Amino acid sequence: MHDPRRYRKFAAGTQPEYLHPAYVSSVKRAPTEPLILLPHTKTETSGPVFGHSLVTAADSDLTAQHSGEPLGERIIVSGRVLDEDGRGVPESLVEIWQANAAGRYLHKMDHHGAPLDPNFSGCGRVMTDTEGRYRFVSIKPGAYPWGNHHNAWRPQHIHFSLFGAGLLTRLVTQMYFPGDPLLEFDPIYNSTADEPARRRLVAKFDWETTEPSHALGYRFDIVLRGREQTPMEK
């Protein structure tokens, strides 16, 4: 019998290529030999797992992790983690990390001259609920130069990491903001050849989650696999 829920492989061009010459570091990182499929044993498929009790409500509000408020435009980023049939994926660990409002990461390898914000660490995490929903409160990140090519600037973006039943089932992607003029020039964003697929990386302004006098809302749904899969980093 035909099963309409069977896995539908993503179409060519809807995921980033391993090698995208305009993205300079991919030239050295891309595999030069055929990939080797490693069989999964029960050990890999059953664990290790992330302790849900380690995730607290404070982890999802990046504006309330220090004694003072961070600088910048406050935003609410929410959405659902979905499978290929549009069903919510419950109890998935979602992590984010990002630059501050000035375009600076709290990382020893970030040498951008923009200032750090003592009230903003730029990372958070949350577990999806029974319907696959998640929600973060944060600050809209700034653009920053990154040296890939002449006058190279990364668009405003937030990194997402998603874990499945175990820590070995991890997917990583980036969320961008609507109307950003830098998207046209960004080789990472454009490493996904299919334009409709690229647009799935751009969040939508969400009036329903926008809070009066507090924060603008953005919706970003993440599809884990199938024909409508969100482009994921290799």
Residue ranges and their predicted role:
Residues 1-234:
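Beta-strand-dominated extracellular/periplasmic modules and repeats
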